[in-house]
Amino acid sequence: YNYGRIHKLNNGWRGKIPFYSINLGGGIHLIDIIRWITREKFKKIKSYSNKIVTKNTKYKFYDCICSIIKSNNNKIFKITSNFGCVYPHFHKFIVYGTKMTLEKNQDCLKLYKKNAFNKIKISKINLKYKTIDKGVMINKILNNILKKSNYLEINNDTFNTIKYCMAIEKSIATNKEVILK
């Protein structure tokens, strides 16, 4: 997660509250994407953090977190929340596979495949993102909870994602790998 808006940490509400986690405020979106695509459950998380970019600022917390996550099916995921980077705000996403690799960057989706001669062929798909009104999305979720429509599904997914984010926080605080149940 390339945040690229360091001024929001230094001058906005994120730097003024008693605790702000770039993991809970940013990395959580990547965990959501991974879980949505793979449906994987995580069994181990080890995270590292630093405060280099915001070292001499009012912002008191980490500006970069990198987590290595192992799933129950032994897939490995790496999530980086880089809030101090010089990069447009964007959720970069790469899936490496044995038959193809998918890379989602700002302006396109790239598929890397090998042909019969073992040469890599790159297919590029241009993307146009729709902007989503977060207020509408939040109201939809709240209405589902209040009506108990898909309540269990929303709850379990949401709580599992939060559980994984809290394991990242614990790994940083203890400087240890966290084993999940």
Where are these regions (language model features)?
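Predominantly a Rossmann-like dinucleotide-binding segment in NAD(P)-dependent oxidoreductases
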Residues: 1-58, 175
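Active-site rim elements
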Residues: 20-21, 125-128, 147-155
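A structural signal for well-ordered alpha-helical segments within the folded catalytic domains
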Residues: 28-32, 132-139, 156-163
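Secondary-structure boundary/capping signal
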Residues: 41-42, 46, 75, 149-150
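NAD(P)-dinucleotide binding in Rossmann-like oxidoreductases
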Residues: 56-62, 72-137, 154
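C-terminal helix-rich "cap/oligomerization" subdomain common to oxidoreductases
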Residues: 72, 140-181
